[in-house]
Amino acid sequence: MFNQTQLFVFLAVFTTSSVLGNNNDVKDGAASGAHSDRLGLWFGPRLGKRSLRISTEDNRQAFFKLLEAADALKYYYDQLPYEMQADEPETRVTKKVIFTPKLGRSLAYDDKSFENVEFTPRLGRRLSDDMPATPADQEMYRQDPEQIDSRTKYFSPRLGRTMNFSPRLGRELSYDMMPNKIRVVRSTNKTRST
Protein backbone atom coordinates (compact mmCIF):
# COMPACT_ATOMS: atom_id res chain seq x y z
CA MET A 1 0.00 0.00 0.00
CA PHE A 2 2.75 2.40 0.95
CA ASN A 3 4.67 1.39 -2.18
CA GLN A 4 1.68 2.25 -4.35
CA THR A 5 1.46 5.69 -2.79
CA GLN A 6 5.18 6.30 -3.29
CA LEU A 7 4.87 5.25 -6.92
CA PHE A 8 1.93 7.61 -7.44
CA VAL A 9 3.80 10.53 -5.88
CA PHE A 10 6.91 9.80 -7.95
CA LEU A 11 4.90 9.70 -11.18
CA ALA A 12 3.10 12.91 -10.28
CA VAL A 13 6.37 14.72 -9.52
CA PHE A 14 8.03 13.37 -12.66
CA THR A 15 5.11 14.45 -14.86
CA THR A 16 5.00 17.91 -13.30
CA SER A 17 8.72 18.44 -13.63
CA SER A 18 8.71 17.30 -17.26
CA VAL A 19 5.79 19.60 -18.11
CA LEU A 20 7.16 22.57 -16.21
CA GLY A 21 10.70 22.12 -17.41
CA ASN A 22 9.74 21.70 -21.06
CA ASN A 23 11.90 23.84 -23.31
CA ASN A 24 10.15 25.30 -26.35
CA ASP A 25 13.27 26.83 -27.91
CA VAL A 26 14.21 25.64 -31.38
CA LYS A 27 17.61 23.98 -31.40
CA ASP A 28 20.21 25.38 -33.76
CA GLY A 29 20.61 23.47 -37.01
CA ALA A 30 17.54 21.34 -36.49
CA ALA A 31 14.97 21.27 -39.22
CA SER A 32 11.43 21.53 -37.94
CA GLY A 33 8.17 20.79 -39.64
CA ALA A 34 7.52 20.20 -43.30
CA HIS A 35 9.46 23.33 -44.32
CA SER A 36 13.04 22.38 -43.62
CA ASP A 37 14.54 24.72 -46.23
CA ARG A 38 14.31 27.90 -44.14
CA LEU A 39 18.00 28.58 -44.71
CA GLY A 40 18.71 30.21 -41.41
CA LEU A 41 15.67 32.43 -41.26
CA TRP A 42 14.52 32.97 -37.73
CA PHE A 43 10.93 33.62 -37.01
CA GLY A 44 10.12 35.26 -33.72
CA PRO A 45 7.63 33.84 -31.28
CA ARG A 46 4.01 33.96 -32.29
CA LEU A 47 2.07 36.78 -30.82
CA GLY A 48 -0.08 35.75 -27.89
CA LYS A 49 1.74 32.48 -27.28
CA ARG A 50 2.03 31.71 -23.60
CA SER A 51 5.20 30.32 -22.20
CA LEU A 52 5.02 27.21 -20.03
CA ARG A 53 7.88 28.38 -17.89
CA ILE A 54 6.79 29.06 -14.37
CA SER A 55 8.97 30.57 -11.74
CA THR A 56 10.65 28.32 -9.16
CA GLU A 57 8.26 29.57 -6.49
CA ASP A 58 5.33 28.33 -8.57
CA ASN A 59 7.12 24.97 -9.04
CA ARG A 60 7.30 24.53 -5.30
CA GLN A 61 3.64 25.39 -4.89
CA ALA A 62 2.64 22.87 -7.58
CA PHE A 63 4.85 20.21 -5.99
CA PHE A 64 3.28 20.79 -2.57
CA LYS A 65 -0.20 20.62 -4.08
CA LEU A 66 0.67 17.28 -5.68
CA LEU A 67 2.00 15.94 -2.38
CA GLU A 68 -1.13 17.11 -0.61
CA ALA A 69 -3.35 15.44 -3.24
CA ALA A 70 -1.36 12.19 -2.94
CA ASP A 71 -1.69 12.28 0.85
CA ALA A 72 -5.46 12.84 0.58
CA LEU A 73 -5.70 9.97 -1.91
CA LYS A 74 -3.83 7.66 0.46
CA TYR A 75 -6.06 8.72 3.37
CA TYR A 76 -9.29 7.95 1.49
CA TYR A 77 -7.86 4.70 0.14
CA ASP A 78 -7.12 3.56 3.69
CA GLN A 79 -10.72 4.34 4.64
CA LEU A 80 -12.05 1.78 2.14
CA PRO A 81 -13.12 -1.63 3.44
CA TYR A 82 -10.36 -4.22 3.30
CA GLU A 83 -12.17 -6.25 0.62
CA MET A 84 -12.15 -3.32 -1.80
CA GLN A 85 -8.46 -2.54 -1.40
CA ALA A 86 -6.12 -3.94 -4.00
CA ASP A 87 -3.81 -6.71 -2.87
CA GLU A 88 -0.12 -6.09 -3.08
CA PRO A 89 1.36 -7.88 -6.07
CA GLU A 90 3.61 -10.81 -5.30
CA THR A 91 7.23 -10.10 -6.05
CA ARG A 92 8.16 -13.63 -7.03
CA VAL A 93 6.32 -16.01 -9.27
CA THR A 94 5.57 -19.35 -7.71
CA LYS A 95 4.38 -22.27 -9.76
CA LYS A 96 2.24 -24.73 -7.85
CA VAL A 97 2.33 -28.30 -9.09
CA ILE A 98 -0.50 -30.54 -7.95
CA PHE A 99 0.42 -34.17 -8.50
CA THR A 100 -2.45 -36.55 -9.11
CA PRO A 101 -1.36 -40.11 -9.79
CA LYS A 102 -3.10 -42.07 -12.50
CA LEU A 103 -5.30 -44.96 -11.50
CA GLY A 104 -3.44 -48.22 -11.21
CA ARG A 105 -0.06 -46.58 -10.84
CA SER A 106 1.93 -46.64 -7.63
CA LEU A 107 4.18 -43.89 -6.39
CA ALA A 108 7.18 -46.17 -5.94
CA TYR A 109 7.85 -47.78 -9.30
CA ASP A 110 10.82 -49.79 -8.00
CA ASP A 111 8.78 -51.55 -5.34
CA LYS A 112 6.56 -53.91 -7.34
CA SER A 113 5.16 -56.11 -4.60
CA PHE A 114 1.62 -57.31 -5.19
CA GLU A 115 -0.61 -58.12 -2.27
CA ASN A 116 -2.55 -61.36 -2.26
CA VAL A 117 -6.17 -60.38 -2.83
CA GLU A 118 -8.96 -62.87 -2.30
CA PHE A 119 -11.26 -63.30 -5.25
CA THR A 120 -14.92 -62.45 -4.75
CA PRO A 121 -17.20 -63.88 -7.46
CA ARG A 122 -20.12 -62.02 -8.94
CA LEU A 123 -23.59 -62.54 -7.55
CA GLY A 124 -25.37 -65.56 -8.98
CA ARG A 125 -22.20 -67.06 -10.46
CA ARG A 126 -20.85 -70.37 -9.27
CA LEU A 127 -17.19 -70.94 -8.63
CA SER A 128 -15.66 -73.27 -11.16
CA ASP A 129 -13.91 -76.40 -9.96
CA ASP A 130 -10.47 -75.26 -11.08
CA MET A 131 -10.71 -71.97 -9.17
CA PRO A 132 -9.29 -72.27 -5.65
CA ALA A 133 -11.33 -70.89 -2.80
CA THR A 134 -10.91 -70.82 0.93
CA PRO A 135 -13.07 -73.22 2.98
CA ALA A 136 -15.12 -70.34 4.30
CA ASP A 137 -15.95 -69.33 0.74
CA GLN A 138 -16.92 -72.91 -0.15
CA GLU A 139 -19.36 -73.02 2.75
CA MET A 140 -20.73 -69.59 1.96
CA TYR A 141 -21.47 -70.30 -1.70
CA ARG A 142 -22.60 -73.94 -1.33
CA GLN A 143 -26.29 -74.36 -1.98
CA ASP A 144 -28.78 -76.88 -0.68
CA PRO A 145 -29.12 -79.98 -2.88
CA GLU A 146 -32.90 -79.47 -3.08
CA GLN A 147 -32.44 -76.04 -4.62
CA ILE A 148 -29.91 -77.16 -7.20
CA ASP A 149 -31.63 -78.04 -10.45
CA SER A 150 -30.13 -79.55 -13.56
CA ARG A 151 -31.30 -76.53 -15.54
CA THR A 152 -28.94 -74.20 -13.68
CA LYS A 153 -25.99 -75.64 -15.54
CA TYR A 154 -27.40 -74.37 -18.82
CA PHE A 155 -29.57 -71.47 -17.74
CA SER A 156 -28.68 -68.95 -15.06
CA PRO A 157 -31.64 -67.12 -13.51
CA ARG A 158 -31.53 -63.54 -12.35
CA LEU A 159 -28.61 -62.58 -10.17
CA GLY A 160 -28.95 -64.01 -6.70
CA ARG A 161 -31.90 -66.27 -7.52
CA THR A 162 -31.42 -69.91 -6.47
CA MET A 163 -34.98 -71.20 -6.03
CA ASN A 164 -36.78 -73.61 -8.30
CA PHE A 165 -39.22 -72.03 -10.64
CA SER A 166 -41.26 -73.22 -13.58
CA PRO A 167 -40.50 -71.34 -16.76
CA ARG A 168 -44.16 -71.22 -17.91
CA LEU A 169 -47.36 -71.17 -15.92
CA GLY A 170 -49.40 -74.37 -16.05
CA ARG A 171 -46.57 -76.74 -16.89
CA GLU A 172 -46.67 -78.45 -13.50
CA LEU A 173 -50.38 -79.24 -13.68
CA SER A 174 -51.36 -82.88 -13.84
CA TYR A 175 -53.11 -83.63 -17.09
CA ASP A 176 -55.03 -86.62 -15.69
CA MET A 177 -57.95 -84.45 -14.67
CA MET A 178 -58.45 -82.95 -18.14
CA PRO A 179 -60.28 -84.71 -20.98
CA ASN A 180 -58.21 -86.50 -23.57
CA LYS A 181 -59.59 -84.61 -26.52
CA ILE A 182 -59.83 -80.85 -26.31
CA ARG A 183 -61.25 -79.07 -29.28
CA VAL A 184 -59.84 -75.61 -29.87
CA VAL A 185 -61.58 -73.60 -32.55
CA ARG A 186 -60.73 -70.13 -33.67
CA SER A 187 -63.20 -67.96 -35.43
CA THR A 188 -62.08 -66.04 -38.47
CA ASN A 189 -64.63 -63.30 -38.03
CA LYS A 190 -63.77 -62.63 -34.36
CA THR A 191 -67.05 -63.92 -32.95
CA ARG A 192 -67.21 -65.53 -29.57
CA SER A 193 -68.82 -68.82 -28.83
CA THR A 194 -70.92 -69.05 -25.71
Swiss-Prot record:
The biological process GO terms on file are: neuropeptide signaling pathway; pheromone biosynthetic process; response to pheromone
| GO CC term (a single one) | extracellular region
Q: Where in the cell is it found?
A: Secreted
Question: Could you tell me the keywords of this UniProt record?
Answer: Amidation, Cleavage on pair of basic residues, Hormone, Neuropeptide, Pheromone response, Secreted, Signal
Q: Does the keyword Cell division apply?
A: no
Q: Where is the signal peptide?
A: 1-23
Residues modified as Leucine amide are 47, 103, 123, 159, 169
Which InterPro entries would you find in this protein's record? Answer: PBAN, Pyrokinin_CS
Q: Listed GO molecular functions? A: neuropeptide hormone activity
Give any extra note attached to this record.
Juvenile hormone seems to allow PBAN release, which then induces pheromone biosynthesis.
**Role:** A hormone that controls sex pheromone production in females and pheromone responsiveness in male. Also mediates visceral muscle contractile activity (myotropic activity).
The protein depicted here goes by the name: PBAN-type neuropeptides
Q: What is the lineage of its organism?
A: Eukaryota, Metazoa, Ecdysozoa, Arthropoda, Hexapoda
